[in-house]
Amino acid sequence: MTMMDMNFKYCHKIMKKHSKSFSYAFDLLPEDQRKAVWAIYAVCRKIDDSIDVYGDIQFLNQIKEDIQSIEKYPYEHHHFQSDRRIMMALQHVAQHKNIAFQSFYNLIDTVYKDQHFTMFETDAELFGYCYGVAGTVGEVLTPILSDHETHQTYDVARRLGESLQLINILRDVGEDFDNERIYFSKQRLKQYEVDIAEVYQNGVNNHYIDLWEYYAAIAEKDFQDVMDQIKVFSIEAQPIIELAARIYIEILDEVRQANYTLHERVFVDKRKKAKLFHEINSKYHRI
């Protein structure tokens, strides 16, 4: 195993640890593509964790500087400051793919702002956040998952990322409240007459369910729009993207089956993932 192979393996371990659903799906890509996904995922994870986990603004600055070095001089040797193994893997990807570096910087800017979290006044602010933390990831992955990326390809990948982030929010309402965060907008909380603290303490009510389903309907519509345009991605990537997205959309039904609980994180079990795998395998005859 070469040193570069070890770098990609390290990135893969990060992805498997933090997103079993993504790993389950994207590990089925051809080798070069899946390695690129591992590297990009690992970079995005380190960006996300720099503040939330490490509480280290300097580490986030180092990540940004390392990415800028790769963008400016992709073929030069660099003394990376953040995580050398991840950055070497990213540099290798950047030498072969047209990486949308600005999307990395947009993600970093969102993480900077997230240090001083305040509730969103409107849904427009919430959806802007979903772009910043996840739509950006879709943009960065676009050259890996398509043969000839176009404006439409970037738009579809961006919308998929935003949809998956909204599903994360719908899954983690209670966990986020424990961490003193409410991502639903004040505008929509007022409209549906919902107080998350009250729901957390006293249990789910019809107002909360209506609010939750309002956002779920948005995520489901975006998911369907992506599925309707999935052919913008490469033939190899189409079944993989559909598998990852369908595993994620299944989370919404898991929340429903758990009676919208705020006190337990739901997940899609291996049996259901395997069922989705076989359904999509039959559809595409490829995986």
UniProtKB/Swiss-Prot annotation:
Pathway: Carotenoid biosynthesis; staphyloxanthin biosynthesis; staphyloxanthin from farnesyl diphosphate: step 1/5. PROSITE patterns: SQUALEN_PHYTOEN_SYN_1 (PS01044). Its cofactor is Mg(2+). It catalyses: 2 (2E,6E)-farnesyl diphosphate = 15-cis-4,4'-diapophytoene + 2 diphosphate. Mg(2+) 1 binds at residues 48, 52. Keywords: Carotenoid biosynthesis, Magnesium, Metal-binding, Transferase, Virulence. Mg(2+) 2 binds at residues 168, 172. (2E,6E)-farnesyl diphosphate 1 binds at residues 18-21, 41, 45, 171, 248. One of its GO terms (biological process) is carotenoid biosynthetic process. GO terms for molecular function: 15-cis-phytoene synthase activity; geranylgeranyl diphosphate synthase activity; metal ion binding; squalene synthase [NAD(P)H] activity. Binds 2 Mg(2+) ions per subunit. CDD domains: Trans_IPPS_HH. (2E,6E)-farnesyl diphosphate 2 binds at residues 45, 165. It holds the Pfam family SQS_PSY. Its EC number is 2.5.1.96. Belongs to the phytoene/squalene synthase family. CrtM subfamily. PANTHER family: BIFUNCTIONAL LYCOPENE CYCLASE/PHYTOENE SYNTHASE (PTHR31480). CrtM is not functional in a C(40) pathway, however independent mutations on Phe-26, Trp-38 or Glu-180 are sufficient to permit the synthesis of C(40) carotenoids, such as lycopene and 3,4,3',4'-tetrahydrolycopene, although there is a decrease in the synthesis of C(30) compounds. The combination of mutations at Phe-26 and Trp-38 appears to be harmful for the general performance of the enzyme. Upon coexpression with Erwinia geranylgeranyldiphosphate (GGDP) synthase, CrtM produces novel carotenoids with the asymmetrical C(35) backbone, such as 4-apophytoene, and the production of the natural product 4,4'-diapophytoene drops dramatically. Involved in the biosynthesis of the yellow-orange carotenoid staphyloxanthin, which plays a role in the virulence via its protective function against oxidative stress. Catalyzes the head-to-head condensation of two molecules of farnesyl diphosphate (FPP) into the colorless C(30) carotenoid 4,4'-diapophytoene (dehydrosqualene). This is 4,4'-diapophytoene synthase. The gene is crtM.
